[in-house]
Each structure stands twice: as C-alpha cells, then as structure tokens.
Amino acid sequence: GAFLHDAGKLLQRGLGSSDALPEQVRNLEGTLCPKAQAGEYYTHKHVLFTELLFHDLEEQGLILPAGLSRRNVRDAAVWHHKPESGPVWGWIVAEADRLASGMDRKAKDAAAERDDDQRTRDFYRRRPLRSILSAVRLGDPAEPEKEGNRFHRPRPADPETIVAAADKHERELPGDYAATTEAFRRDWVALCREVRQTASIFHEGVIGLAERYWWGVPSSTKDEPDVSLLDHSLAVAAFAACLHAHHASRDELCDPAAIKDRSRPKFRLLRGDLSGIQNALFRLGSEQVKGVNRILRARSFLMGQLVEAAGLLIRRRLELPPYVVLMRAGGQLTMLLPERSDIEQTIEAIREEIDEWMATRWAGELALNLGLTEPLAPEAFLRDRIVETLERLRAATEAAKERPLAAFLRKNGPVLRQDYEQGADGHCPACGVRPRKSDFTEDGIARCWACHHEYRLGRRLPKLKQLLWLDGPGDEKALDLFGEVRLRAVVDKDDEYKHRQNVVSGWRPWGAEHVPWPVATRPIANYVPTFDARDLADASKKYRGLEERERSEEAEEPVEIGAIKTMAHIAADAREPDGDRWIGRPLLAVLKADVDNLGQIFGAGLGANRSIGRLVALSRALDWYFTGRLPHLLATRWPDTYTVYAGGDDLLLIGPWRQMPKLAGELRADFGRYCGNNPSLTLSAGIAFVSAREPLNRSADAAEAALEAAKGRPGKDALGILGEVLPWTDPARGLPWLLEKSDWLCARLREDETKTAFAYKLLSFLELKARAEDPVKPDPWAAIWRARYGYFLARTYPPSPAEREARRQPAIWSEFHALMGLDAKGAPPPSKLAI
C-alpha cells in the first residue's frame, strides 16, 4: 500500500481530470482529500486516482494474491494525506512519505494542487521529469547549469527511452502519460489475476511494473521534479515497512503519537560490500584455461548476485518485503532495516552463515562484509542530518571490511580443512588454487566447486530468460548459495522450472518481454558477440589460421550463425579486407572504465538536496547506464565486443584491438549525453592491447594500470593507452587527434603510398626528437633527426615538377608534419601512439 500511495499521480496526469473518474470514485473526494487551509477547495486529488486502481480490481471481481488484504492495501495507499480520518496505516505512510523526501511537506505543495484550475492541470501534465544526473554538482553550486539532455518522457523503460532529451517535449507529454497510464492499468490488473503467486513474487511484480512505467514520471511537479515516482515510492515503502515492523514489535501500531515520534531510534542502515572482487574474478590457472569465457562470465554475474542473495536472506529472516533494499549495484547492497531487539542477533547469525559459505567456496579470496549502523531516529533522515547518517553507514562498512570473514575465523581458525583434506585430487585447472574434485566434472574436466558451477552457469547466461530464487528443493540446475537461498537460471521453454511454489523471487532480463512470468524485469549486461551471416561468408579468409569448423568452446557446436565467438575469433575480427585478402594482426584490446569521483558524487554531489529518495534515484540512474544502455550500444554499434562485466559504475570489455579506442571515445560521448553533458559526471578508461592467448588476469591488470594512469591526470576524465594519457575531446592532442591521424596513416599504408618501413622510420625520428628535446639532459647529436626526417620525406614523396618550379611543398608533407607534431603549440601530441 505504501508503495502505491502516489500511483494516482501517473493516472491523474494520464486521464487529465477527475471528470474521467467513475462517479463512485469521484464521490470519495470529501472522504479522502484534505481541504486547503482556507477551506475553499480540496487538495491532493491524486489519491482518488490511486483509488481507481482498486476500483478496477473490484469491477473485475479480483482479489490480491497470496492472501493479501485488498482493503488494508487500499487503506494504506489512499489515506496518507488525511491520516487522522482513516485507519492507522495512514499515519505510517504519511510519516514514511515525509522521511523519504528528507523534509516535511511544504505548504506550497498543497496550494499547488488546485486541480480545478486549468492552468495548474496543464502545468503538471506538461512538466517532465528532470534527470537526477543533471542535478549533480561537484564544483560551485551557484555555477549556471550547462545545456544538455536533462528531461525524460514518461514512456516505458528501454535502452533508448532512458536517455534524457534536451527538449521538454511539452506537447507530447499528455499523450505519453495517457499511453503509459493505459498500459500500467492493464498490466496491474493482469498481475493481480495471477492468484497462485507468493506475496514476495507479487511485491516484486508491482516493483517491476513501476520500474517499467514509473521511472520517467516525476513524483512531484511543484518544487524539484528530479526524483521519479519509482524511486520516491521505493523509499516510502522502505520506511513504511520498517516503521510497521518496529511499532509492531512494541505493540504500538494503533498509537499515532508513537508513530510520529521522530526522536526515538526506529531504524538501522545495513550495507553489504563484496571485497576481493578483482582478485577473485581473474583467478585463473597459469596454463590456458578451457572454458575461460564461460567461467569469467559466470563469475562476474555471480558476484553481483551474491549481494542480491544476501539481501533476500536478510529480508526473509526479518520478514520484510523487497522494498527495504534501497540500492543494489557494483558489488554493494544498501538496506533500511527496523530497529528491533533481535536485529543485531539476527544479522550476526546471517553473517556467520555467509562467512562460512564464502570462506569454503572461495578459499578466503572473496568476502561479503555486512556493516550495520547503530539505531537511528527518524530525524536522522531529514535533509540537515542525512550527511551525518551516511557517514555513520560508511564507518560501519569500513569497520566490517577491516574484519573480513571474522565470524568464520573465530569458529574455525585460518586453515581450511574440509575441501582440502576430503576428496581433493590436486589443484583446480581453472583457478589453480582450490582443490579439484571428481564430483565436479563437466565435459571431461574435474574442477573445484566454484569453477565447476561457474562453468555450467556461464554456458546458460547468454540465453537467460528467467532468473529465479528458490526457497526449498531445487533441481539439478539450481545453485545452492548461503542460507536457504538457491539460484536457478532458465534459458528456454524446455528448461522451465516446474516447482513455482518454491520461487520466492525472480526477474526477466530486459528484452525478454515474450516470457510471461515473472513480471519483474531488470537490465543485465550479458552481451556477447555471435557469428552472423557476414562472418561465415568471410570465414575462410577472415579467420585464416583458425579451423573453419572449429568447435566453439561457448556453444559446443560447429561455428554457425548465432554461436558465440571465441577470443581467437574476436581477435581475428580486428583484421580488415584488402581486395581478396584480409590483413592486419589478430589482437585483442581490454577496456576498463569507471565513473570518476564516485564517492564525492554520492557524498556531496546533490548538495543540500540529499534525501534517501534522491540517492536511490542516483544509484539506479548510473547502474542503468552500464546494465541497460551499454549492452544496446554494443549490440548495435560494436557487436564484436565481449562483456566481462558491467554494472554499478564500471565495466570491463574485450574486443578487436583496432576498434577499441573508437569504442572508448563513443562510450564516453554516449555517457556524457546520458548524463546531460554534466561536467561533474565524467568517465575515465584504460586500454591494454594483448594477444588472444594472453592470460586475462594479466590483461585486466594492464588495463587497470592504464585506467589508474588516466585517473592520475588533473581533472581525470581521460583515456590511458600504451603509456599515454589522452583527454577525451582535445582536438590538438587528445583522442580525436589520435584517431584522425592514425586513420590517415592507415589509409596511406593501405593504398601502398607509404611503405610500412617508412612508418618505422617515423618512430625512429620520434625517438631522436625526444632525446634532443629532453628537458633534463638533451642530446645535441640527436638533433640530426630533423634533417633525416626531411630527407626521407622528400625521397618518399618528392615534389612534382610544378611544385618544384613554384617552390611549393607537397600538401602531404604538411600532413606528415602534423603527424610528427611539428606544428603543435604547447605539449606535443601523441605522435608515437598514432603511428
């Protein structure tokens, strides 16, 4: 009910007027709506449109699934603006509403809701959601905002619609609202028809509908329309669930004074932080690992799902709905919990279970640290206190990270015995550190527990249609995690999980709309390159040196349309056609990138406007770029790129070496558009060039080093590549210059105007130039480079007779002078890198 408390705001904007409401609903105006201070009109009429959702169910004779009381849910949703006249739920939702906003309701909010005024009605129907990303400020908050893509239209979420636009589209907004309202009402009724689903699945289904339809709807059009109805409603539902649990434990649900008391501690914040990700992700044996693509894909996916599993276990043990999970991205989990007498004991018991499982499965390399704050009063979430509250959460998290696996070590000591002493048969060939066991054999290879299940899961992820969480017996394809939690991936109809009664949570990836259940959808960065008809037509030449019928280690079938490419094939995609042959070196590039200054963005980026609702919105917006927008960008623009991981605020991609610098530049430009070209939100990246047989752990380390070099540049927002750090947009010495000059030189080489040997000569001239211009110890003998350069240039591109007569240099000389940086002012361009 708390989650639906403002659902009527969408319907109100979609239907346009209370005249569109059924008379039975319209007659409740005096019952549900408060009056303005002067008493001459009713305000907050969106509650009538929320009432319409329940009227729709009544009209079709529907009840809520899982025994949920339609009356209680309805009362919680519609009474929050007049709680003194309704049931006790109204007080809980009203208080949760204020806490989620980080402030009390302003008087002008009520005054602005004069729905009978045509100007006001047109205003709220034509005011778009402002991107929360455009509100981030790391510099002077008084600095004028730059123009950019700042406005969202209220349309269903997909990789294209989540990108903000520069235009407000005021004329189109009423039509958008009408279409979205119609779709939401239809899907709401359809969700409620499925009476066999559990309460948890129903809750997640409602959240799923909201993620699809509410993300682009402003929760308020009065003051700061930069928090969506989705994010505000999630925060309100989290506070309401915890208030209910807290007061229920003290038998105070019927005590409005206790509910409104903001000085008494009622909440806790919990953060789960997965540490050791980088080492655990790239823990590979020194020899060539069979199935490495699968294993890495599954590892990165599982590491994201471990925090999901922890959140599921915690809320089920505490009997809380899914709304209490505030943020979940990038290996971190943030939850709002009720303050109760059993909270610390319950969390400690969960910590022990998680530590035991993590220590034995990952041999101490990976830890999920749970930091729990001290009890927090409601006033700690108001805007003037939220900074202090978040600092408490950070301190609790850091304290937990300093004691990884502490619960396991207290009980068992530092030596792992069970797996290493019982049934071990040498080291695992995949990770090289954990014990191999014959019980975990797939495709004739025995591995450790973790690598075995990663290998199996990695085969299924590219075709994922459903991700289900089970509480109860699974089947042979289910993966047991800690506590009672099991994970089951479904890839097609033949793979359907039969025991739906055991499913306690689940979702479908974006793009799997044809799968009818579960209703919840999420973006997931699982794009991998596959063979298409053009690849197969060119296979005999493009993939020269590879067996044309080579069995793909991904698909376990001959190379064919739709089969997943191996790293060797991706490397070969770097080659380019030259007549009837393909030329170039088959190499890979590893791209690692992340958002700059993330701590500052969440700590101070929203200034005085920090609230739980805004922080939730900011976290989701960033995560959706990497999990929702990026896969679409790869599939449509860079289809030969392999996703190792992407989510939260960072990514790791592997692709053909020739395309990766261009991909990085386009990625930075697209991220800038997504963020409204906000200078406070920037991206840095590092690229490493490697062979297809290079161990990926070393490749990732090299990309990480390049990324760190980029972040060492003042202002960050740069690309590290081959020992250089380039600004993204500088036309004189940045990435645009590099791409332009390298493409120009490639064209000369391809047309055979310039021999490859001459390119190496240019590099030798640059070496001499650097020695001659060394600011510490210049070499005067190296100054001869200029004469040698001029001689070789004149021999390779001699002037024509007309140019000699006119004493004019060939135009191509100027191009080479620019390539060598002879016309540069200030710092030299990356000439060596371009060549």
What is the role of each PLM region?
Residues 1-165, 172, 179, 214-219, ...:
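Divalent metal-dependent catalytic cores for phosphoryl transfer on phosphate-bearing substrates
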Residues 311-335, 361-365, 370, 472-504, ...:
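Conserved helix-loop-beta segment at the catalytic/binding core of cyclic-nucleotide signaling proteins
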Residues 338, 349, 353, 372, ...:
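Cyclic nucleotide signaling catalytic output domains
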Residues 716-835:
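Long, compositionally biased charged/polar accessory segments in the mid-to-C-terminal portions
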